[in-house]
UniProtKB/Swiss-Prot annotation:
The keyword Lipid metabolism does not apply. Binds 1 Mg(2+) ion per subunit. GO terms for molecular function: dITP diphosphatase activity; ITP diphosphatase activity; metal ion binding; nucleotide binding; ribonucleoside triphosphate phosphatase activity; XTP diphosphatase activity. This is dITP/XTP pyrophosphatase. It catalyses: XTP + H2O = XMP + diphosphate + H(+); dITP + H2O = dIMP + diphosphate + H(+); ITP + H2O = IMP + diphosphate + H(+). HAMAP family: Non_canon_purine_NTPase.
Length: 203
């Protein structure tokens, strides 16, 4: 029996990633209807798992009976004490870095990361993604995925989003922003988490 998952995210890149990762299954990935009109909950969790569950349970109340998928994901850099972590999307905003700049949030986040990593020898980092599915305010499944890499000093590639241009995969000698979408989803934290999650959902 086919499943329909309503994604509680306005991030077009994430929605695309989920659809590609689920493409070989009977699962239909749809945006949550009316998401733009819903006031987002405050992400008060201190871990990716807490925030993913909080969002899934909150948004599932807006789609009675439906399965709502939420994620919390980000970048952890060892030399920065695992920052930006759960604040990855708001890294520059939290630091009041380039306020009022016409640059996008992703661009400012990447610039701040480059600044913080200037002269740092330990370049190890990892992407982490936790997915949660809830129905009627109750989490019914969750899964985590991660991928290890290195943080570059300058961006490479124009694909992807977020920190992808700085996230280097040594085994491919490319950044996440330089690989095709199929390869990215095969290797990425988000693709790994979704594959585990789909196996855990009730048929």
């Amino acid at each position: 029996m086919a499943l329909t998952l309503y994604v509680a995210s306005s991030n077009a890149g994430k929605l695309r990633d989920f659809r590609v990762a689920a493409g070989h299954t009977a699962t239909e990935i749809l945006p949550l209807p009316g998401l733009a009109e819903i006031d987002a909950p405050e992400e008060t969790g201190t871990t990716f798992a807490e925030n993913a569950r909080l969002k899934a349970e909150f948004y599932s109340r807006c789609r009675p009976g439906g399965l709502v998928l939420a994620d919390d994901s980000g970048l952890e850099v060892r030399a920065l004490g695992l920052l930006p972590g759960v604040r990855s999307a708001r890294f520059a905003e939290d630091a009041e870095y380039l306020p009022g700049s016409p640059l996008s949030a992703d661009e400012r986040n990447n610039l701040l990361l480059m600044d913080r990593m200037r002269g740092v020898e330990d370049r190890a980092g990892r992407y982490v993604c936790v997915l949660s599915v809830a129905r009627d305010g109750v989490e019914i499944a969750s899964a985590e995925g991660e991928v290890a890499g290195e943080i570059l000093g300058v961006p490479q590639g124009t694909g992807g989003f977020g920190y992808d241009p700085l996230f280097y995969l040594p085994e491919l000698e490319k950044t996440m922003a330089e690989i095709d979408l199929e390869t990215k989803l095969r290797l990425s934290h988000r693709g790994a988490a979704l594959r585990v999650l789909l196996a855990r959902l009730p048929g």
